[in-house]
């Protein structure tokens, strides 16, 4: 982006820039900062000293390529080498060696890391900035209670509160509080120093009685009193060093370490001049905070808004990786100390190489990327998803909030989010408002503040230069910021005399001369997902939120298509996602193929490999298609190959299809969608999906498992696709139940376990019974497809710990079908309810049948009118062969600008194509269309158009499930839950009431016994189903009732149940 003093317009920053900058900051500064903190380590006799030389650390280039790391399930990392020295103090000798400390996972060109073959991304966290915050709350009597909350760098809190008698307390937990005098004395101040350093000493003296004086008579007394209140379990503690250490560890270290940012905030808020390197809370801070609190009580000073972004900080990738590096060095320090002591004890001569091991660093990073809540598996459904995932901001995670405890106020939009955090793009459900998305131009500045760019209005200086400023949330409050964006920076354009502006979180209307800054871009306050919605200003924010989330779920289609109506950001999104192949040098194409492009430039030939049918972790297909012919001269930065869901270097997530808005026989009731068979037969919404199935071979106690094609337990039909090694052949078509990898596991069978006739037959005929069981990899239900890749990965080392892995990749071609979910870009989503023959679909006046029929009742109540504008403009663009790229909020140029644009384009289309039905003045945008079944026109004119419709990842093939019988839970003996476990459907309390209401007693009994947890009855059902006959009625209670009885018995409640016979109603007592 342009810096200060540059002319012209700003450019859109790289969407992955935040991730790259964070990682570079960690490598350049974070590593050095943590290595400098590594202490000199001495042995107990202080004869040997070990130290690291920070000036010379090296990161080695990775030995493997990114693609190989993914396929072989390895980590794409760099080895870290640091020089270390061992000094013998007696002889003053020093031994210096370069040591391998461990592996640090590197960031690749997508802004992600590859750990154990999986793409992972670290998302940024928003935390409360350390410092002090004053707020007031009403107590149960309606009286204002003022509190000052000190937040430490670790997230620990210490609250100062003032009561009705003007006494000041320090609250260390919800139940415990101590006098501020005791706390100050425990921190090392005496009474005289306290009274000298406060503005209101008489208030402090007013609550000082004899008991208090005794408590603060000496530092030891104060510490004892503090310990008794805060950490003591019972008894009378005695002052000692261990007591001080425990208090230091439990309280002061967690709640009193402010860090550099906290010290800066503290000094600024309390008008102190304590040096920046003094990062701990001092008695002086506590007393100044108490003074401010007393001032608040008497109406002086201002309260703080905890939710303002100036009181938040961003914990970026750099901070998280640096914290983990520091943790690894602490572990390394403990290892080195232990090794030195062991070597001295056993009279061995240590060397730096022997003292240091790479395990602490490598395992710390592996566990961080694998287990930390902010390290997530990269969502790669489509190119947009990849970029958006790295730009998320989360309030959740260590030191943050939880979905259960976060209040509405925290989740809400705040005026300081303007241009920094998108007001639309957030997750739905329990985390709404807690996971946000960065605005397009926002960046992370010094100290973790979010900065947004503005243009400085420099008409007063009469210069033609345009200065761009990046302002943090604390600075932009003091400027008048014009809300109008600057697209054309021509100084001669006469601005309006009165403009809307923002000042100190208020929106005003002021004269143009008073404006200091102006926004730089119409999309400045939106995230990437929201910026891809055309006519977003005509939509309700809830629907825009759904749309920005659903675009991330769009499946890349086999034949992608550019949108007719877009916003202009599609090219940038596709470029930054890294799915397209781009020329790094200019030159001439000398060879092109499906797997590589060879480029000749500056006398060198450069081979550019293309991605071929690569699986993403959402099982979508990533594939690159060459876009340049042989012999063509190209320039640097030109697109050589399109990736998944891109066309000509632009993002293309869906298709432009002909849509009509009308109810059709109830088939589009409640957001259902009716589609034409053309979408199926012409592969318009066909997508490819790649599934990965893997199996490992282990060495068991009976011997190693074998991969073989000779499986005596299975019929030959299931093994038809196996080669001589027992692995499925490339290119073969496999159905559910087929064996992909044949595997036998050895097992020992005792002689006594065979039936006597078995033993006799084996003795007579000499038959060898198989001593192994089959543990083959079989294709699960719904997995049919073509085998496109097989990989046999053999890891180095012993096979016990590193088993061989065989991965089979199967490609599925999925057409659109009933039950699939489709959506537009305005939150208009629906499930396909019926696929009609094209002759039955409603058709236009030129005879074209429509492709989809949406329900018009889904528009007015949801207030997403943008879809109607897009629909009509798409029709005009299709007829005129034009593509439109429209920035949002065009009503600022003139009233009804969007409607005028759409109508003028429709009018032009009707003139050029000589089709008057395209624009009919009586009902503009609508047209009379005909019922395909009868040929009669519908009663009213209908809106028709060409919107951009996406097919989403929620597909019926992944969700449909049925079960006759299957696995049962061990304790309750009821069917398991969920599709993955072949589970059954639960008939719960309310379902039982519904069946009772209809009086279907036999169905209800089946549901609660045979089909559920009556063990004997369900076995008899299977038997009678095979043999024939009537199913006997169950005579005893089901297993869940027995379980209830047992659980009550564990509570010492004896419960017996009785069965009353139908004939004579005598009570037959049965033992439960």
UniProtKB/Swiss-Prot annotation:
Subcellular location: Plastid, Chloroplast
One Gene Ontology CC term in the entry: mitochondrion
GO BP of this protein: DNA-templated transcription
Catalytic activity: RNA(n) + a ribonucleoside 5'-triphosphate = RNA(n+1) + diphosphate
Subunit text: In plastids the minimal PEP RNA polymerase catalytic core is composed of four subunits: alpha, beta, beta', and beta''. When a (nuclear-encoded) sigma factor is associated with the core the holoenzyme is formed, which can initiate transcription.
Family per similarity comment: Belongs to the RNA polymerase beta chain family.
Name of the protein described by the UniProt record: DNA-directed RNA polymerase subunit beta
Organism: Eucalyptus globulus subsp. globulus
Upper classification of the organism: Eukaryota, Viridiplantae, Streptophyta, Embryophyta, Tracheophyta
Gene: rpoB
